[in-house]
From Swiss-Prot:
Zinc finger (RING-Gid-type): 334-396
Protein name: Protein fyv10
Signal peptide: none
Localization per Swiss-Prot or TrEMBL: Cytoplasm; Nucleus
Residue span(s) of domain LisH: 133-165
UniProt record, GO biological process: negative regulation of gluconeogenesis; proteasome-mediated ubiquitin-dependent protein catabolic process
Recorded GO MF terms: ubiquitin protein ligase activity; zinc ion binding
Domain of life according to the entry: Eukaryota
Role noted for this protein: Involved in the proteasome-dependent degradation of fructose-1,6-bisphosphatase.
Family under the similarity heading: Belongs to the FYV10 family.
Length: 411
């Protein structure tokens, strides 16, 4: 009885290892909002306090007319009102983030109130988490409308990061369309954080603008490209000198050049249109890094743990490939061998089995596969299409004579 209770006891801390991003993102958004307010206040303070002193001194010394003093005060009031509007907008975002954090903490707190895995409340909590993981996967895959609808139907809008991923996908799609405006605006809003990033997103975007200027072949654009490079690319000379030297070569080689490595057909060429897909992927990686989001969908991470517990050497053998062998019966019962999960599990480690369970009457077939004799005979009857005196391998579909079976002895 004690062993049974131990096996079903719920360890909340282990379960929450997968849910760290649930609280990490709201914390990151709150930190960014605080930094934004801090920058706004400091910028306005640096302007208003000196301007106020200057206006007061000028008024006392009669250096300006009353109308000029009023105009200066009106200008300062306008800036303060603009600051107030910006801070009110940030405050609304902050309230939303705090509400999300509260709902997420409550969701995780419910897990600590569940004593056993057999409790019906655990099934309910797990269902909510599964819905969250599915929505997360759909958002990362670009199915934003379906993800929003699912989150709304399940009532988990505060437990998923809809707005963050919608913005991410919108900017990523704009890059695939060949537009850099939204991505550069995002870089400007996150300039301070990008300085600590391992990716050089802004440099790559400015480089792409330079490439597009030269792609036209217009001589007028040539001068614009040179000015653009001087303004936006040269500041990266210390870290991106190799790429800048390659980019300088574009001034001598037009888009239709056959010279390596600038010709259009070369995938590594700066003229290649595949660079837009590269920029889109680079933006997504940078975005996730700045917001402390996992690079892989949480659903994949959760599945990987279970897949490694089920995986055996036969799951990816030449005989059980679900894509090449339609006779395989493992495709319907083994998650690893299923079409949907086969590739995801390919790089997973095999399950560690401390105990071995062996059939009492093992035999080996000519193809090297080992089964229990009685179970093989029963399975052959169930599969049908087997002549008398023959058996069918349930994994590969091959048919052999019973006389070809050899008894296996385990030492």
């Amino acid at each position: 009885m004690a062993a049974e209770l131990t096996s079903t006891k719920l360890n909340a801390e282990n379960h929450l290892l997968l849910d760290q991003p649930l609280l990490r993102l709201p914390h990151e958004l709150a930190r960014r909002n605080f930094k934004s307010v801090q920058r706004l206040v400091e910028r306005e303070r640096e302007y208003v306090i000196p301007a106020l002193k200057e206006a007061a001194n000028a008024s006392l010394s009669n250096a300006q007319t009353p109308d000029q003093t009023l105009a200066a005060l009106d200008s300062m009031l306008a800036r303060m009102q603009n600051l107030k509007r910006k801070m009110e907008s940030i405050q609304q975002e902050e309230k939303k983030v705090q509400n999300q954090s509260r709902k997420r903490i409550q969701h995780l707190e419910h897990l600590h109130q569940i004593p056993s895995l057999a409790d019906v409340k655990y099934d309910q909590w797990s269902r909510i988490r599964l819905d969250r993981l599915v929505v997360d996967h759909m958002l990362r895959s670009g199915y934003t409308e379906s993800a929003q609808q699912l989150a709304q139907e399940k009532g988990i809008e505060d437990l998923v990061d809809l707005d963050v991923f919608v913005q991410c996908q919108r900017i990523a799609q704009s890059l695939r369309r060949g537009e850099t405006k939204d991505a550069l605006q995002w870089c400007n809003e996150n300039k301070a954080a990008l300085k600590k990033s391992q990716f050089n997103l802004e440099f790559e975007l400015r480089l792409q603008q330079y490439i597009e200027m030269l792609r036209t072949g217009d001589r007028g654009k040539l001068m614009d490209a040179m000015a653009h490079a001087k303004r936006y690319l040269t500041p990266y000379t210390e870290t991106q000198s190799k790429e800048i030297h390659r980019a300088a070569g574009l001034l001598a080689f037009p888009q239709d050049t056959k010279a390596e490595p600038y010709k259009l057909t070369d995938l590594q060429s700066m003229y290649s249109f595949d660079r837009w897909n590269y920029l889109s992927d680079l933006f997504i990686r940078t975005h996730h890094e700045l917001l402390s989001l996992p690079s892989s969908p949480l659903l994949h991470i959760a599945l990987s743990a279970g897949l490694s517990a089920l995986k055996t050497p036969s799951c990816h053998s030449a005989y059980t490939s679900s894509s090449s062998n339609f006779l395989s019966t493992t495709t319907s019962v083994c998650p690893i061998c299923s079409t949907e999960l086969n590739e995801l599990a390919r790089n997973m480690p095999y399950a560690h089995h401390a105990k071995s369970y062996v059939e009492s009457d093992p035999i080996v077939l000519p193809n090297g596969r080992i089964y229990g004799q009685q179970r093989l005979l029963d399975m052959s009857k169930k599969l049908g299409c087997v002549e008398t005196g023959k058996v069918k391998d349930p994994t590969t579909g091959e048919i052999f004579d019973k006389s070809e079976m050899k008894k296996v002895y385990i030492m």
